[in-house]
Amino acid sequence: MLTKFIASVALVLAAIPAAQAQLPDQQTVTDAYVYLLGRAIAIRQEQTDLKEPGIAYNVIKYNPAGSADFVNPNLDVAYLEAWIAVDGKTPVLLEVPEVKGRYYTAQILDEWGEVITNINERNYPSHPFGKFAFVAPGSTAKVPADAVRIELHSRKAKLLGRVELKTDPAGAMALQKQFKLTPLGKPDIKPAAPMASFGNKELIGVELFDNVEAVLASALDVSPIAAQMQAKVRDIGRQARDPGQRQALDKLIKEEVVPKFLNYAVTRSGVFQNNWLATLGTGNYGADYWKRTSANLVGLWANANDEVIYFVATRDADGQPLNGANDYVLEFSAANRPDAVVNAYWSVILVDVPDYRVVKNPLNRFNFNSDSGLKSEADGSLKILFAPRPNAAVPESNWLPSAPGKGFSLTLRTYVPKDLVKRGEWFPPAIKRLK
């Protein structure tokens, strides 16, 4: 009798529609989603980059110096970028010119957004320029005797080079063009991993978990909890393939998971003080995949804090959104000036919101930096004005124009910040509205 009862129960359970099967708990889905989204954002960028005319693996793209055409641009450097692709037998050689008297770095990142290294005189004091050979993990391929051997985390990496413009943009551009990338053979290059298209305004849903095995196999994650997280991802991937659960899983992701992640990315992924958000802890994330994915979403390819820390402000000292209807002043005391807390340089840029583009103005003045020749006050303090028109309270040379009546955001960059900045002990002062 008992055997017959168990058999009948089994038949009834088998007949229950798959849609009634229980979904994984919301936290498991959230963790798996946030973890894998970081990789998806990098895949999306790879797909986008390789669609551009003239862009190919192991080919450097030399971006225009100080171009204001990008979103929240860095107008202080000449940029160069490339996708590096190697295989077990084929290294890729990077040649770095000798750079004197200005900041430079060749930042190398893996496909999860982790910084592998920065090639410059600080990290390679005995070989600050010359040849650097990138090889696949575990590769025994020979490299030139005069090249520094650098093992990548997987078979692809992103190169982002920066050369400070200072007061000589032509000189920076000449140096930029001297960075060369050459494969030592013909590497077997796999295309970007499969990933459905998505935008930041409407993040990907359950489609994130399609092709899970191919995505995870495409790039090694060096996070100490990668195995644990990838087990969760595979579990959700199995659920996503179940037609009875797919719709419910997509609904959960879009209505609960995505809003929770976006709130974290905007309000909790950095350190807030004086209504400035500091990008502390970027570049190398350890087990903190929430911060890594947030950094990838907000500014993919974030660098390590030894190289740069960003401070971002969208509100004034009273917590009100910055707006071009008002005049604001950022006042550094003589002892708290940004030039005193960097070993390279600092800069501040104003961009409109929500487009994050520079504000066109007759002065073509979009940012200030260490070489802008700003006027100090008699006591050594420094005032910077953000307003739609000059204000007698601040020297006109220190005025960054805003768009009348339009919201804006400020980004203050500190390059090669000193230890107190990296420890979170220095922040820009709150931005005050002039009455």
Give the predicted meaning of each segment.
Residues A21-K435:
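A compositional/structural signature for long, glycine/proline-rich flexible linkers
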Residues M1-A21:
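Gram-negative bacterial Sec-dependent N-terminal signal peptides
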